[in-house]
């Protein structure tokens, strides 16, 4: 069950001792990675809690979130990212935002952290493979970054691109997917307040294996839509190609909304295995966020537009 909308609560209403400690740890972790400017800004602003969209479900243990991952740039097995992602250098790092906009710009990752109001969002994550987690992300709304570049009326979609650096991302040396990894959203999906760019989890700086230093989180969609280690965001007029849709278009659609009524060709999507639980649980339409996002797809055939 989701708790109240953000306007109904203030940070003071919900900030307990545990959140305070995670806030402090995140600031300290950021400083430890050379983010002194960002850390100072975070200290002044505080890390706010986004209660309006956060679930009350217990978060998955951090050790599971950081050791059970899909990140094919570091290998195809679940343990590969945590074992191999240490080779990735996340500083210096820039993100180019361009395309159909009035003010294209290149942002240093530290400036993005410093210049945006960071929130903790506790979201469900449902993998297309049939397992799920609950993850306490730290990030900021994607719409805030898009607004900075002033999109034009031609901006109908948003395309995302991961870093291409085979020397540090060994999985890119193999043609498992068409590299670099690409993803996309419709513009109205991208500016929905649920969609965030994450820079941390559990109050700490985002681990490499979870998509450092910047990843997309779209909780009503299957996890592979959450592109990791982003270096480019482009506002475009036509639907962009996406990695898994290019590889297997009959199995992975562009939208990839969580839908228990639409099975993967090789397995059911009706239930899921929550990491750490024994029994399977029913999968919720839109991963339980339908009250917020279902109107985006009003009148669409969701089986055809999977």
Swiss-Prot record:
UniProt: Mo-molybdopterin binding residues: 69, 72-73, 127, 162, 210, 215, 226-228
Catalytic reactions of this protein: L-methionyl-[protein] + a quinone + H2O = L-methionyl-(S)-S-oxide-[protein] + a quinol; L-methionyl-[protein] + a quinone + H2O = L-methionyl-(R)-S-oxide-[protein] + a quinol
Span of the signal peptide: 1-44
Gene Ontology terms for molecular function: metal ion binding; molybdopterin cofactor binding; oxidoreductase activity, acting on a sulfur group of donors, quinone or similar compound as acceptor
Listed EC numbers: 1.8.5.-
Cofactor: Mo-molybdopterin
Cellular localization per UniProt: Periplasm
UniProt entry tagged with the keyword Oxidoreductase: yes
Phosphoprotein found in the keyword field: no
PTM entry text: Predicted to be exported by the Tat system. The position of the signal peptide cleavage has not been experimentally proven.
Keyword terms of this UniProt record: Metal-binding, Molybdenum, Oxidoreductase, Periplasm, Signal
GO biological process, one term: protein repair
Record-level GO cellular component terms: periplasmic space
Purpose of the protein: Part of the MsrPQ system that repairs oxidized periplasmic proteins containing methionine sulfoxide residues (Met-O), using respiratory chain electrons. Thus protects these proteins from oxidative-stress damage caused by reactive species of oxygen and chlorine generated by the host defense mechanisms. MsrPQ is essential for the maintenance of envelope integrity under bleach stress, rescuing a wide series of structurally unrelated periplasmic proteins from methionine oxidation.
Subunit structure, interactors included: Heterodimer of a catalytic subunit (MsrP) and a heme-binding subunit (MsrQ).
Listed NCBIfam families: PRK05363.1 (NF003767)
Family note: Belongs to the MsrP family.
PANTHER family: PROTEIN-METHIONINE-SULFOXIDE REDUCTASE, PROTEIN-METHIONINE-SULFOXIDE REDUCTASE CATALYTIC SUBUNIT MSRP
The protein's name in its UniProt record: Protein-methionine-sulfoxide reductase catalytic subunit MsrP
Gene (name only): msrP
């Amino acid at each position: 069950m989701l708790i109240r909308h953000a306007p109904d609560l203030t940070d003071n209403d919900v900030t307990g001792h545990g959140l305070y400690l995670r806030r402090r740890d995140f600031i300290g972790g950021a400083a430890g990675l050379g983010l002194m400017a960002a850390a100072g800004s975070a200290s002044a602003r505080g890390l706010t809690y986004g209660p309006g969209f956060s679930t009350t479900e217990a978060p998955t243990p951090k050790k599971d979130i950081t050791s059970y991952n899909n990140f094919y740039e570091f290998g195809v097995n679940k343990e590969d990212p945590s074992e191999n992602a240490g080779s990735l250098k996340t500083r210096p790092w820039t993100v180019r935002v361009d395309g159909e906009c009035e003010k294209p710009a290149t942002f240093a990752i530290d400036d993005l952290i410093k210049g945006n109001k960071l929130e903790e969002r506790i979201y469900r994550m449902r993998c297309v493979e049939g397992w799920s987690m609950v993850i306490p992300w730290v990030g900021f709304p994607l719409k805030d970054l898009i607004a900075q570049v002033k999109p034009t009326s031609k901006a109908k979609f948003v395309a995302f691109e991961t870093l291409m650096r085979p020397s540090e991302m060994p999985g890119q040396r193999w043609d498992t997917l068409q590299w670099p990894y690409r993803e996309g959203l419709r513009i109205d999906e991208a500016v929905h307040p649920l969609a965030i760019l994450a820079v941390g989890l559990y109050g700490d700086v985002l681990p490499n294996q979870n998509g450092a230093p910047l990843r997309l989180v779209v909780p009503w969609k299957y996890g592979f839509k959450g592109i990791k280690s982003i270096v480019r965001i482009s506002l475009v007029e036509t639907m962009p190609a996406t990695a898994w849709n290019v590889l297997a278009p009959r199995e992975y659609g562009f939208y990839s909304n969580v839908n228990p009524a639409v099975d993967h060709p090789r397995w059911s999507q009706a239930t899921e295995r929550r990491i750490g639980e024994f029994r399977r649980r029913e999968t919720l339409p839109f991963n339980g966020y339908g009250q917020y996002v279902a109107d985006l797809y009003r009148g669409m055939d969701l089986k055809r537009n999977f």
